[in-house]
Amino acid sequence: MNQKHSKDIDARLQALGITLPNAPTSAANYVPFVQSGNLVFISGQLPMVDGKLTCVGQVGAGGDDGVSLEQAIDAARVCALNLISQLKPACDGDLDRVVRVVRLGGFVASDNNFTDQPKVINGASDLMVDIFGDAGRHARAAVGVNTLPLGAAVEVEGLFEIN
């Protein structure tokens, strides 16, 4: 067992008041994750809760279609919860098999003048550290894009090492 994180991730989740959502189904012709050796590559996750997209639009845009920084950070956290929900079956239901979070890739649908993509993706990064401790610290990209699938404001993909 990797001593860099809790011996019991389920207990850590419970202590944090987190209930993992059901893993969202794929929206197109791809699989939710692929395992190669000890690495698990998880497809990009949108801020979906109970099959519904919770955050739509461009971050930093004004008007009714605009998404605030705070809303986007919350959406990134939901994406991270969905990543972990996809990871759990790759670990045969045992998240204690996670050795480390290797990398997150975050995409933020951004207004042309919005440049705080790293702050948005911190919503996902912070959650990984909260859950996995030091093993949750990871390499990362935070990229601004014009649009994302289904009009989502945020998408996060992940790479994890398991034993």
Label the predicted regions.
Residues N2-N163:
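Short, polar/acidic, helix-capping and beta-turn segments at strand->helix junctions
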